[in-house]
Structure formats: C-alpha cells, structure tokens
Amino acid sequence: MAEQYADKQIKLFSLTANREIAEKISQASGIPLGKMSSRQFSDGEIMINIEETVRGDDIYIIQSTSFPVNDNLWELLIMIDACKRASANTVNIVVPYFGYSRQDRIAASREPITAKLVANMLVKAGVDRVLTLDLHAVQVQGFFDIPVDNLFTVPLFAEHYNQLGLSGEDVVVVSPKNSGIKRARSLAEYLDSPIAIIDYAQDDSEREEGYIIGEVEGKKAIIIDDILNTGKTFAEAAKILERGGATEIYAVASHGLFAGGAADILESAPIREIIVTDSVLSKERIPSNIKYLTASHLIADAIIRIHERKPLSPLFSYRSDKKD
C-alpha cells in the first residue's frame, strides 16, 4: 500500500458497482475511501448519505456504469448532486467502464444518441471532470463540455504479453472486426508483431463467412477488442484463426461484461487465455481461462496527477512494476 497521501482536501468515494477496484485505487494512491452509504427503498429509489464533511474538498467518485447500468448511473448522478449540495470544491467522476458509450451515433433512422444524453446528464448534475478507461468510441469525449481523460490499457496488456515472451514476428495481433484495426495496431507496435483482421463477406449475421486479412498460419494469435460482452465475437474469431493455422490463440479486452452465457461460449472456444482489466465486477459466471489485470495503479496515478495539476501524457506509455 502506498504511503498516505499528504493533501487532506482530496477525497475518494466508492459507490456500489465495483467496490473492489475502488479499494485497490485507494491503496495505490494512499487516499482512504470516504464514508458514505447508499441504499435502495422497496420501490427502487436510491438514497445516498455522505457521512463526513466534503466542504471545500476535491471529490473523486468511483463508479463503473456496468450492469445494472441504469441503477449504477442513477446512483452516480445522485452522489454527484449530494456532493454539490454539500459544497464540495470540485466533483470528479472516475468511471472505469462507461456504459452507453456504444450508443455514440445514429446507426438507423430515429435512433437516439444516448452517449450524448448521458454526458448531458452528468454535466448538468455538476461534474467538473471525467476520468475513464478505454472508451468504446473516443469521440464520446467530445460530447462533454468539460475535461474528459480517457486512459488506455494497451500498454498494460503489452507488458503482460512481453513477460510471457509473446512478441516478435511469430506472434500476430488480430482485430476480430474491421472497426478495431487501430487498437490492434497499437498493441502490435508494442510487441513488434504484425497484425491481421477478420472481416466478413456480408453483415454480422453471417459470422461463419468470416475470412482473415493477413498471415496467421504457424503464428501465435492475440485477439484484441475493447468490450467482451457475450463472448461470441472472440469465440467465432478464434475458430476462424484455428482454421487458418494459428498455433496458439489468446484474447484480450479492456472490459469484461460476460453477459448471458459468455462463460460457456468462451470455455468451448479454442482460446488458451483471456485477459481483461478489473474495470467491471461481473456478477455472471466467469470463464475458467480468464485472467484479470488490475487497472487500479494506472487510475490512481491519473487521479494524483490531475489533483497536482501534472500532465497525464506519461501514462499513455504506462508501465507498472506493481502486482495485483
């Protein structure tokens, strides 16, 4: 655990979505978690009570807006309001997983842009700054009229794979869809490895028609995506890579949601190991081949840098020498 942080005017509070990562962030930063309570009435209404003064303090509220996304979002909004009404100096939110970020555009007629709606609600509630981790769409930052710091997890993953010796020309980094090329290229640059892409002849409903752009035969493949939801994308990509001659298949994602029967799907896929961060505390069954890498040190460093008005740019080539 880090030494206690000297400045007493910064306070961390954890809401209920992911208490585990909040405790790790507290330990890594040396800032104790503040005292507060959150409960639901029988009709589902949320009630929050901050059990210590926050007057004049810089507040950081830690809350992933994962499942149940609406409960977690409303709990966050209510906590923001409570801090503002208690005369906090600034209210900053730490959202390791930002729910609704996939609804960032109008993909079909008469659809909403819900990511923008959520941004509006947070700003209206009184947020001064947002700190998040691997937004699904980086343009969501532009939906806010306040600073949004979007940390990247690729350096953490690269460190893990370099330690395993998974680097160089005998490894290929694979994007399981053409929209993820930039992410795959970023990891490939850290590993000095080539990239490949899995594309599809038609739309996503014809997954069995997938084909590989790039060379995977005789190589160890690492599939990378930002969100692991049902596991179907990873499982289908792994089968295509196996048919393409990949010798070993690994997978990595920033956020592990594990919705529905993801565990069964992933355990039956030819994937040796799946890496995710601890941004989401899933209540679903977790596949046996999952390994968690903590993002808590990265987030803790960012919080301290923001509070001390230091640049965050060193964190974008982040290397952690700390263990889970």
Swiss-Prot record:
Annotated S-S bridges: none
Cofactor note: Binds 1 Mg(2+) ion per subunit.
GO molecular function, one term: kinase activity
Pathway: Metabolic intermediate biosynthesis; 5-phospho-alpha-D-ribose 1-diphosphate biosynthesis; 5-phospho-alpha-D-ribose 1-diphosphate from D-ribose 5-phosphate (route I): step 1/1
Any one biological process term the GO annotation gives: ribonucleoside monophosphate biosynthetic process
Enzyme class: transferase
InterPro entries: PRib_PP_synth_CS, Pribosyltran_N, PRibTrfase_dom, PRTase-like, Rib-P_diPkinase, Rib-P_diPkinase_bac
Record field: catalytic activity: D-ribose 5-phosphate + ATP = 5-phospho-alpha-D-ribose 1-diphosphate + AMP + H(+)
Keyword Nucleotide-binding included in the entry's annotation: yes
Binding site for D-ribose 5-phosphate: D225, N229, T230, G231, K232, T233
Keywords (A to Z) from UniProt: ATP-binding, Cytoplasm, Kinase, Magnesium, Metal-binding, Nucleotide biosynthesis, Nucleotide-binding, Transferase
Positions with a binding annotation for ATP: D43, G44, E45, R102, Q103
Main subcellular location of this protein, as a coarse class: cytoplasm
E.C. number: 2.7.6.1
Amino-acid positions noted as binding Mg(2+) in the UniProt annotation, renumbered to this chain: H136
Cofactor: Mg(2+)
SUPFAM superfamilies per the UniProt record, alphabetical: PRTase-like (SSF53271)
Keyword field contains Metal-binding: yes
Gene Ontology cellular component list: cytoplasm; ribose phosphate diphosphokinase complex
Subunit structure: Homohexamer.
Family membership: Belongs to the ribose-phosphate pyrophosphokinase family. Class I subfamily.
Role of this protein: Involved in the biosynthesis of the central metabolite phospho-alpha-D-ribosyl-1-pyrophosphate (PRPP) via the transfer of pyrophosphoryl group from ATP to 1-hydroxyl of ribose-5-phosphate (Rib-5-P).
The protein, known as: Putative ribose-phosphate pyrophosphokinase 2
This protein's encoding gene: prs2
